A protein has these predicted regions:
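C-terminal catalytic histidine-bearing segment of alpha/beta-hydrolase fold enzymes
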Residues: 226-271
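Short beta-strand/loop motif that positions the catalytic acidic residue
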Residues: 202-204
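Serine-hydrolase catalytic machinery in alpha/beta-hydrolase-like enzymes
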Residues: 12-45, 50-147, 245
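A conserved short beta-strand
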Residues: 175-185
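Acidic catalytic loop of the alpha/beta-hydrolase fold
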Residues: 207-211
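Short alpha-helix in the alpha/beta-hydrolase fold that links the catalytic acid
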Residues: 92-93, 212-222
């Protein structure tokens, strides 16, 4: 990862310019401390969800937690992890979405860290910072290939995964039917955004310093320039307010955001 000279990590400012810079926030103490460490938790799926592997274009394999639709379906929801990795909270969230979508959609929570899972801030920061964009893209492309050429794919993610939810939609091409990003770093390049084949629902936190209101405003402007549709909601909340692994999540804001995301995803995947 290359740090742009114009980007600084003073704890009082810090607006990352792209996903690579966002990952370097792992070195920022204020950013690390904005993530409460998850409590120990073991998830047992009640709907047949299980870990699986899929091939990636670079000749390797990647991991995912898959909940198969009750009846054969080409519809998929990709779930992108927080900076902790594909932990049991994300698996639980994947099953929550599986049930919310009435078991009619395949739900795949994608392991972006190749098996590494953090339980503390130091390890989470280390894993996020070490994640290499070429490999991350290969993992996403492998998941898209697994879904198949005729798949209809929507995505959702938080923080690190919020940025990758949008990048996933870009990589999905014509298979993309929806994208929900929770306080993730938006893609800034208008030419890239022009290739989007779906609209975007962006859920953001008004009290945070990193994916700030200014970053959101720039994203809206860039999407307009790209002639793409985006709906944004800025909650009066802190970064990570709705993270599945957050033991101190904002209950009211999380519930409202979930309802927004649910209405959006049901419209794109069930209608």
């Amino acid at each position: 990862l290359v740090l742009k000279p114009s980007f600084t990590f003073a704890q009082s400012c810090c607006e990352p310019q792209n996903q690579a810079d966002f990952q370097l926030l792992a070195d920022n103490k204020a950013f690390r401390m904005s993530h409460d460490e998850p409590r120990p938790f073991t998830f047992v799926s009640l709907t047949g969800g299980e870990m699986m592997t899929f091939k990636t274009p670079d000749g390797k394999t990647a991991n995912g937690f898959l909940l198969k639709a009750k009846s054969k379906s080409k519809k998929y929801l990709f779930v992108y992890q927080e900076w902790w990795g594909l932990n049991d909270y994300i698996k639980q969230e994947a099953e929550k979405w599986y049930n919310e979508l009435d078991g009619q959609v395949n739900v795949l929570a994608i392991d972006m860290y190749d098996g590494k899972i953090a339980t503390n801030r130091d390890d989470a920061g280390k894993y996020m910072k070490e994640a290499q964009e070429p490999r991350l893209e290969q993992i996403v492309k492998g998941a898209i290939d697994f879904a198949g050429r005729r798949a209809k794919i929507a995505s959702i993610g938080w923080c690190f995964g919020g940025g990758w939810s949008l990048k996933s939609a870009l990589l999905e091409g014509k298979r993309a039917v929806g994208c929900v990003m929770y306080y993730g770093m938006p893609v800034k390049e208008v030419e890239k955004l022009k290739t989007l084949r779906t609209d975007v629902l962006g859920i953001f936190a008004g009290r945070e310093k990193w994916i700030s209101k200014e970053v959101v405003a720039d994203f809206e402007k860039n999407m307009k320039s790209a002639e793409k549709s985006v709906t944004t909601k800025i909650f009066d909340a802190e970064h990570a307010f709705a993270n599945p692994s957050n033991p101190n999540f904002d209950k009211a804001a999380t519930a409202e955001a979930f309802k927004m995301a649910s209405n959006y995803l049901k419209t794109r995947l069930l209608n």
